[in-house]
């Protein structure tokens, strides 16, 4: 379990997160939602130890994050950020191999190669394995980075807008894949995401931010409601049933407030 206790963070003199406390459920897909600049990515960077909070603390599996050994932490959590730098003349397979570094320290063994192959297959990029990253489309590169994160094979996977640059087919494929990692392998996945309908269909739990404050949290069905979404996004969103799920219709809306 991930426990967040009274986290506040500021850049220069401006607070971007204020007194955030919550517990993120294990073995679930947790979606961080909210408008641009609400604090979602900052929170993800803090719980992955990429950013030190101004105040407060984070614990993973009962141990304070700052007390984790770096190598042990890299075997426990994976973070795929929003800004990805493409190394010159690196192939897809070479990139995915980096996901095994916390385990192999550069000396790949049979288990490492099996995980690499599995990640390439799950993301459907086996045929791109020998292609150089700078030869790929943005969507293909994104799939390669997701494969690298999967190859790391950690208990916790943190993804910051992983659907960037993906077409509808690949975006849906990735969300189904992440869902299967939770269901079949007991992974805990925290994902920053803007597409509220993917949240509705695939997330188990939602944490919503507005102006740096945690404004709503709970099971997905408790968040996908007109009144709650209005408070989060400042716009009226129609909600329609689709089987046992809900679809949010927000293409023609009226605004109540902008955050």
Where on the chain are the PLM-derived regions?
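The feature captures the beta-strand-to-loop junction immediately N-terminal to the Walker
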Residues: 33-35
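Conserved small/polar residues in nucleotide/adenosyl-binding loops
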Residues: 256-259
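Helix-to-loop junction immediately C-terminal to a conserved catalytic motif
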Residues: 48
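Conserved ABC ATPase signature
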Residues: 132-136, 140
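Conserved ABC ATPase "signature" region
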Residues: 97, 110-128, 153, 158
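Conserved ABC transporter NBD signature motif
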Residues: 56-64, 73
């Amino acid at each position: 379990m991930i426990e967040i206790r009274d986290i506040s963070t500021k850049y220069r003199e401006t607070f971007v997160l204020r007194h955030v406390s919550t517990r993120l459920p294990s073995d679930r897909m947790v979606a961080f939602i909210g408008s641009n600049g609400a604090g979602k990515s900052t929170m993800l960077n803090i719980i992955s130890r990429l950013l030190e909070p101004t105040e407060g603390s984070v614990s993973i599996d009962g141990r304070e994050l700052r007390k984790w050994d770096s190598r042990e932490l890299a075997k426990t959590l994976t973070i795929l950020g929003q800004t990805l730098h493409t190394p010159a003349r690196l192939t897809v397979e070479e990139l995915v191999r980096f996901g095994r570094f916390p385990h192999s320290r550069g000396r790949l063994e049979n288990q490492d190669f099996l995980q690499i192959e599995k990640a390439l297959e799950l993301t459907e990029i086996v045929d791109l394995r020998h292609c150089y990253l700078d030869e790929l489309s943005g969507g293909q590169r994104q799939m390669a980075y997701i494969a690298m994160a999967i190859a790391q094979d950690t208990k916790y996977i943190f993804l910051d807008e992983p659907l960037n640059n993906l077409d509808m087919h690949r975006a849906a494929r990735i969300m189904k894949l992440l869902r299967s990692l939770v269901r079949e392998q007991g992974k805990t996945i925290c994902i920053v995401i803007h597409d509220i309908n993917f949240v509705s269909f695939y997330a188990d739990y939602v944490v919503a931010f507005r102006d740096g404050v945690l404004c709503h949290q709970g099971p997905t069905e408790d968040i996908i409601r007109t009144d709650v979404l209005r408070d989060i996004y400042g716009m009226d969103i129609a909600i329609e049933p689709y089987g046992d799920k809900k679809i949010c219709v927000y293409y023609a809306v009226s605004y109540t407030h902008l955050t």
